[in-house]
Amino acid sequence: MLNRPSSPDGGEAHAWPPDPEIPVFANAEHAHRRPLRWMFALVAVALSCLLATGIWRSRAAPPHAATQTVAPAGQALPPGRIFTVHPREPEPAPLPDMPAAPDPILPQPRPAPPVPPPPIRAPYDYDEPAPRRDSAALKSGPAMMVATAARLGQTERAGMADDGVSADAATLIGRNVSRATRSGDRDYRLLPGTFIDCILQTRIVTNVPGLTTCIVSRDVYSASGKRVLVPRGTTVVGEYRADLAQGSQRIYVAWSRLFMPSGLTIELASPAVDGTGAAGLPGVVDDKFAQRFGGALLLSVLGDATSYMLARATDARHGVNVNLTAAGTMNSLAASALNNTINIPPTLYKNHGDQIGILVARPLDFSILRGTNE
């Protein structure tokens, strides 16, 4: 290869005319370099194939097998890092699903025993003779009503006990349950709630208890409306009490018996009512205000007057003690008088000739009139 002439400063001469006698070997140099390039390219392709083959084998190898590089015969590999691949731990087997707990088996309730049919009992017989009542029971009208209700309640509870109902249940149920009964021959009966018009024959003054009478002013017919059972002119006898409470405006009267013009009598035991059916008889009430408070007021006024007079009559030194003593004495007398008169009961006056009423409280049986012309 020929060297080009250089310039005096050491560089390559810019003007170098080629010598036609000297051959140019530039193309020959390029021709020698081409085989080297192909050789390097083949070596690179071979290395790439080897590298790709090694990577594919390493990935294709099982995960639990450790990779080990074996040197070819007669050659020793340079020392390098050795990686130990531990085998993968097997995943735990899933636990089997526990079966759901079965529903508890409850015992079946036993069927209730059949209830025996209630025994056939005779209905309440109103034909039985009425019990005798003393005068003390007639003095208390509310007590008479309570006794009648208690008797009927005992009858109902006894019937329920016969039907197999407990005593406590019969007591509670008996208040709301009634049994149907037959009233017998309605031509000779007066049912509860019948109104009897009556004219008072005696004056009533409630300072003391006493008797009173009235005369039936209108015929009273039977429950069927066919027969007159209580004719007008029948005398009715009753009793009233004297314990009129403060603020009361009515007196309670209990009528005990009927006396008919034919001579027939029957126990009535029914309360007196006014013309509208309200219980009790109204009248003129004297509340005894003067008797209850007059004495106390008089003593109080006298005490004040005495204190005033003594205050003016005595001197300043001894008047205080005298005034206090007199005032205390009069106040004690007024309090004592008030305690004795404050509980005086009022008095009710009911004049004779007033129109009143009687409300029948129990069934009345007039079967004794059957077969007669009355």
Swiss-Prot record:
Signal peptide annotation: none
Membrane topology label: Single-pass membrane protein
Pfam families hit by this protein: TrbI (PF03743)
InterPro entries the record matches: T4SS_VirB10/PtlG, T4SS_VirB10/TraB/TrbI, T4SS_VirB10/TrbI
CDD domains attached to this UniProt entry: VirB10 (cd16429)
Record keywords: Cell membrane, Membrane, Transmembrane, Transmembrane helix
Spans through the membrane: 38-56
Biased composition range(s): Pro residues: 92-117
Compartments in which it is found: Cell membrane
Gene Ontology cellular-component annotations: plasma membrane
Main location (coarse class): membrane
Disordered: annotated span: 86-117
UniProt similarity note: Belongs to the TrbI/VirB10 family.
NCBIfam families for the chain: T4SS_VirB10
Protein name: Type IV secretion system protein PtlG homolog
